[in-house]
Amino acid sequence: MVLRAHAWRVKGAWWSLRSSKPTPVRSAGRGRFDSCPLRPSSCPIFPDDQVNPPRLRSIPAVDAVLRALGTVDLPRPAVVAVVRRELAALRKGTEVPGPEVVLQQVRTVLAALLVHKIRPVINGTGIMLHTNLGRAPLAPAAADALQAVAADYCNLEIDLTGGARGGRASYLEHNLALLCGAEAATVVNNGAAALVLLVRHFTAKRPEVVISRGELVQIGGGFRVPDILEASGARLREVGTTNQTTLDDYAQAIGPATGMILKVHRSNFFMSGFVQSPPTQEIARLARSKRVPFVEDLGSGAVMATEKIGGLEHEPTAAEVLGQGADLVCFSGDKLLGGPQAGIIAGPKKAIAALKREPFYRALRCGKLVLAALQTTVDQCLAGETGNLPVLAMLQTDRASLVSRAEKIIAALVNQPLRVSVGQGTAQVGGGTLPRSTVASVTVDIVPGELPLETFSQRLRLGAVPVVGSITKKQFKIDLRTVFPRQDTALVQSIMAALTAAPGRE
């Protein structure tokens, strides 16, 4: 049987095959076809219960949900999108919950979205360069410099002397070169970008990169050096074994297709026992004799003698490695240097100029905010004001001051439903640096009464000022070495709020 429609709806009105004019009909019926001229109350083609089943009529309107939500700390279009998405999901389901349940579901989704909004966090983990918490906090002067250029125009690419267009970051690059003991330096937007730029440049005509198998490391987030190199268009020529690589291994691998030798500093792990790898000086001599560029990726980017800070292990500096014969070095700006996320490359003036002429360089260059913060950080390092860099200040904080702060925090919590005491901790530099070094620290150890530790920990993370700590031996531990003294009051308030949070907020 072929069913032919005798009426159809256009722009809100029903048209009939028997009439050249729209025939609007208002009826007592319900559904999309209420005004169909074929019926006063129901459509024979689409029954009312099929078009608008009874279960769908209990779904609240978008406007009703928005009014019930009240004020939400999100842009209204984002809130509207979430509400519409949730209501659409209900329409596809088999059952529709009550209005209060629907409202709570929407609030839960909005809260999950809001928690991902970037904001300050109290770091009580004892990991100073915590990758998940943003690595190095900026020095106050660097933060001020960033804010100053963010709110105003700046001389990003103008020569204020003559008024013509000038070079980007020329002041920063000049001082970076001084800090690294190099002829020249430049900066891109992160450490991996620096390595990619170097590899793309040196393998444009000769595609092979010679690298030891013991240095094919994996960095944070599951990213692996071999994958990064291959994504750059290079072909890896692996030499040696995981624990044993000799200079002869490098020599035998070098050939007409060799574009560069790459040495990767194992900054996020260490090997001991039956291990061997040639020092930088020997690889540099071999590279010069073969006329092959030699690049060393330092990763963490120390610019000072780390062994003089709290008994840390030695971390090679850019100046040290260049002095040992490496052609170029690259490292991150937001680790031991204490600046913003950036990738720094230092070496001969001719090589740096060639890198900056690469078309790919423009895709990696930094904006004014990063340049302003990094410029101030480098200036402080050159001036010997490293004590103003937060991470270095943390490393040098004495135990007595940490104990004093812990006792004051405990005193402020005396009437709260918890057990709290001063504990011992072991802080780490983190961020893939100094893997063998730890620093004795002081913790505030909390047992939150009858509240489960996981619930207490989650409430702290979801509070107005999020607090991240660790659970060890049935205690929640907050390492004060990574908590700034200016955060102590907020820390106390966050702990109190977590203890008294209303049920259902978790």
Segments the model singles out, each with a brief description of its role:
Residues 96-138, 142-145:
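Long amphipathic N-terminal alpha/beta scaffold segment
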Residues 2-21, 25-32:
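Short, positively charged low-complexity motifs
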